[in-house]
Amino acid sequence: MKKVIFLIYVSLFIFNWGKAWALIEVDITRGNLNPLPLAVSPLSVDQNSKEKFKNLLKLEDIGVEISKVVENNLRQSGLFNPLDPKAFLQKPDIAHVKPRFEDWALIKAQALITGEVKIVDEKLRVEFRLWDILAGKEIMALAFTTVSENWRRVGHIITDK
């Protein structure tokens, strides 16, 4: 009887030995992350500031240029899918104050970046806001003041925030 019990223990040990040392192998073939669709509205610029920037920096519309920097940075990250500005239903100067969330939801945007550019004491002042379209509320608002030549850097800083 002792031999039978011993053989049962030995056989259980031998047959389970391989399972105890088995390695789990997982193959990850692709990610499951869809880029977030967001709208980067051109930053609004009042006419007086637009003329000053045009003379100072030789740019037609500094608000559009800063928005392009932000849009390109977000696209290159792979985490965001900036929507085509031609699809936007709301004008940038109105969207900055209070976006019509229904309009942005129609074009499938889940987030919105708006802003305003102006000259204050001969310096560039950029205000930007990040909006959650689905929740219908502002997530973040920041303002930067710098020399006009740093306009591109401001676009990169907005992206980093």
Regions found by a protein language model. Give the residues of each.
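Hydrophobic/anchoring residues in structured secondary elements
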Residues: 6, 45, 114-117
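Sec/Tat signal peptide C-region and signal peptidase I cleavage site
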Residues: 16-22
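Structured helix-beta-strand junction loops
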Residues: 7, 77, 107-108
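Short beta-strand->alpha-helix linker/helix-N-cap micro-motif
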Residues: 29-100
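Sec-dependent N-terminal signal peptides
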Residues: 4-14
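Amphipathic beta-strand/beta-sheet edge segments enriched in Tyr/Trp
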Residues: 24, 95-157
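Envelope-exposed proteins and targeting segments
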Residues: 22-24, 34-39, 66, 70, ...
